[in-house]
């Protein structure tokens, strides 16, 4: 698996912002005291820690493929005594069958060459009366105002790179189909969105994407593999900052969501 975004500070900045409230509200009612939860692809662990606070005293486990990110998650969660972080492989989870009440993954399947296989493995470690809960964005459904033609170029570039890396940037719309292919028959599909429209939210969202387009793994791959020149990437960054500075700027990120019962 290639994680297209990489782990530049501009990427982790957005990951650290994520909580149950803004990223897992669709399954929040399952995070009750005593529930055993596995957070797959946990990144720096802010959602994981939020879950841990809700299910205490039960321990929560967060896994990620990146050892560096797991080390950071452990540092950031120091003082939280009911959370464990470990490196792990979503295709070969190191847990017995029927181990968890909730197996959760946020923005993970879009980066995997075999999302159906990952869902099958998540299903294996889920208890018979538990759920597998997945949320992924749908890049083709991103919507913004005002029109900024260079952002159209940015979106096409990112989707091209993500697919070159074996992922599916429009994963949100495929989640239900992938769940059915993985053998789930009882699936609750929903959708929700992040909206960035206040001056503060626009500045945060625009700046992190501007930084990504000049400094993250996406930018490095774009130059290395001739998807874009440095000048083109800098123009994309400038377009993000123009959008963020516009008093009427508005950006919506659509997410598909599924709650699957084994």
For each feature predicted by the language model, list its residue ranges.
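Conserved Class I S-adenosyl-L-methionine
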Residues: 186-262
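Class I SAM-dependent methyltransferase SAM/SAH-binding core
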Residues: 38-40, 44-92
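Conserved catalytic/acceptor-binding region of the Class I
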Residues: 133-202
């Amino acid at each position: 698996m290639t994680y297209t975004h990489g782990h530049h500070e501009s990427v982790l900045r957005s990951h650290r912002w994520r909580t149950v409230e803004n990223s897992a509200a669709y399954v929040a009612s399952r995070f009750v005291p005593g529930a055993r939860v596995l957070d797959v692809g946990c990144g720096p662990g802010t959602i994981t820690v939020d879950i841990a606070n809700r299910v205490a005293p039960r321990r929560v486990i967060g896994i990620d493929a990146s050892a560096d990110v797991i080390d950071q998650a452990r540092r950031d969660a120091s003082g939280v005594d009911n959370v464990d972080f470990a490196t792990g492989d979503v295709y070969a989870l190191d847990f017995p069958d029927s181990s968890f009440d909730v197996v959760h993954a946020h923005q993970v399947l879009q980066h995997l060459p075999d999302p159906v296989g990952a869902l099958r493995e998540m299903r294996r470690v889920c208890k018979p009366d538990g759920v597998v809960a997945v949320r992924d964005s749908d890049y083709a459904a991103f919507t913004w105002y005002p029109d900024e033609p260079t952002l159209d170029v940015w979106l096409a570039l990112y989707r091209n790179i993500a697919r070159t890396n074996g992922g599916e940037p429009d994963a949100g719309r495929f989640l239900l189909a992938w769940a059915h292919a993985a053998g789930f028959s009882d699936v609750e599909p929903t959708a929700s969105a992040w909206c960035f429209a206040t001056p503060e939210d626009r500045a945060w969202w625009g700046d992190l994407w501007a930084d990504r387009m000049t400094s993250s793994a996406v930018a490095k791959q774009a130059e290395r593999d001739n998807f874009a020149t440095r000048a083109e990437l800098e123009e994309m960054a400038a377009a993000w900052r123009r959008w963020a500075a516009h008093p009427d700027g508005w950006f919506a990120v659509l997410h598909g969501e599924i709650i699957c019962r084994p």
